[in-house]
């Protein structure tokens, strides 16, 4: 990994009320769309004027239910709803590639990658009110991630801010994660 790569880390929280104490201390937070979807009003949490990130809640929906309960249009509306706060980016509704997710859908890894790109395109077409829609790369091996990056084509430019999915639940050798990042950082 090169020293000039800008890695951004966000503290994932499962309840909006946990955000404010963290933002007061200078931490950036990542809040799931699953917990914000039914909130009333346009204020996701106290302290939302600080930069924060919206996670699509994909793992809960896909791994536990085998599909997305929230349409791409509804998710784009959620992004637009909070665009006037400190929301700086939202992840696409990606189909992760952990074995549990593949079993839940009954689909192949390559199909999950194609569905992730299709949902990215649909959310972007629905509009995000200027909030960056983060493309997410999915796979299991370095070649999988590289192929997914290539599948996005011109949608992802050089030096783009992207998410790298299906890493957080891995156990074992951290060198595997380094190999994945090396494979996609070539471009």
Language-model-detected regions and their locations in the chain:
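Core catalytic architecture of nucleotide-activated donor-dependent transferases building glycoconjugates
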Residues: 107, 111-116, 127-129, 142-157
